[in-house]
Amino acid sequence: MAEPQLKPFVTDGCSMMLDGLPDDSIRWSHCCVAHDKDSWLGGTETERRESDKRIGVCISEAAAPLLGDWVEGNVRWGGSPYWPTTYRWGYGWPFWNGLTPRGYKVLTEEEQAQAEVLIPAADALLEQEIGAAKKPVLENAADES
């Protein structure tokens, strides 16, 4: 059986919610894009738990602890690899692995090789998001001087 093919990284920012506030529309989008990168690649249940924790901490720091906790709880439920969604854990891989969903799994050597080819583009997109998220903060600081 041929190895599944990893699709190039795509992100919709904060799936099913706002990327920021009305006056700062991308305030925590970098948190979501980082989480999307993890979700795209998938992996073990422990890796997912750690990734979900990171998005909660990131949004807590970018916005408010209550929002971070809320997002973490929602990605824990909604990002299951067993939901056939565009934002599930491992969404870069085909949903089906034979007759069962892909679910949680350690990447094979072949899958890791595919990922290594595509990760630089995913990292570049993430760096772009981080830069965009920091820009309004730097502009506001300059305005206050």
Predicted regions and their residues:
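Extended terminal accessory/targeting regions
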Residues: 1-145
